[in-house]
Amino acid sequence: MKELYPGDQGIWVQYLQLALQRAGQQVMLDGIFGPKTCAAVEKVMGSSGKCAVKEAQWNRLLPFLRGYITHEVKAGDTFFSIAKMHNTTIERIMHANPGMDAGALQIGSTVVVPLNFPLVSEEVLYTSLLTGWIIEGLMARYPYLQVGTIGRSVMGTPLWSLRLGNGPVEVGYNASFHANESITTPVLLKFVERLLEAYADEHMYEELYPERLFEEYSLYLVPLVNPDGVDLVNGLLTEGFYYRRAVRIASGFPDIPFPDGWKANIQGVDLNLQFPAGWDMAKKIKFEQGYNRPAPRDYVGQTPLSVPESIAMFDFTRNHDFSLILAYHTQGEVIYWKYLDEEPEGARRIAEYLSLIHISEPTRH
């Protein structure tokens, strides 16, 4: 964890401010460690005149980013008293501890205590770090959520996969193929959180019952396909070998703003152009446009499937029998439903339906 001091700016400060907000402090999520943020740190920590954030302070604040704590049961404890102690609800505690007898808590046992706020924020920039905290928190809140990895990125970051349901029909979702499109990651994570919450509370979600959905379908989600690139764009990666190499790559394309215009993985390969289908055609087009070497965007790579993220997504897709895949992007405001002359059965109907509930327009690819 990065040590923070007054005057610091950036993504780490924004995460600090998010934790402070959830701890009850009135601070803006502006990423600037100013006087109000300093005062909030002092108040939460109970230490006047000391607003540096080091390991001990982060350890106090991390539960507000992961969304839960653990409580060791003592004599006389009940779910009600534990909920009151930590300002949360009995229902949240029960959902997180499905195998525990609420009427006979064992002294010394550990209770997972979800804190009483939505876990997936829509107000901060996303990185691999925040995504990992959220996934950990979702697992704690909803222990029946199935979590795994499909591989690792160039820098060794896990490529997380989430599974909801155990039905025979498989549906795939993914987000943040492109580094500067990370707003798609909280879209998927918020979908997961709301669906799990509705399932736990036995409520309907968007006119359907999650229990029935999970019996008929298995939903597989990869919320952060390009973690290294996202970390670069959103300010988590600011030094070291990979950062310096990205700077060198970007210097060859001065018309593309750095890092905001970076779409590729950390090696300068556009993951969305890495798949065997149409690769030769894409190579011809992109090379003619000047993207014939590692670049912030549109470089197809030396060969198809030449970087770990695209290989992981390719293998993951081949290992499943997806009836539908939804790949979330930004910038275009269109829904691609057809690839060249290949049109999956029902694809246009699905795209037209989605266009009715979103601002995007259906279009061929």
Name each region found by the language model.
Residues 1-35, 63-87, 109, 115-118:
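Primarily a LysM-type cell-wall glycan-binding module
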Residues 35-46:
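Short, solvent-exposed alpha-helical surface patches in non-cytosolic proteins
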Residues 47-50, 55-72, 113-126:
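Intrinsically disordered, low-complexity Ser/Thr-rich linker and spacer segments
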Residues 114-155:
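Short glycine- and acidic-rich boundary segments immediately preceding or forming the N-terminal edge
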Residues 161-168, 176:
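Short beta-strand-to-loop junctions in surface cap/lid or active-site-entrance loops
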Residues 168, 182-336, 344:
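Active-site/substrate-binding loop(s) of hydrolase catalytic cores
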Residues 355-365:
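Residue-level detector of conserved catalytic or cofactor/ligand-binding positions
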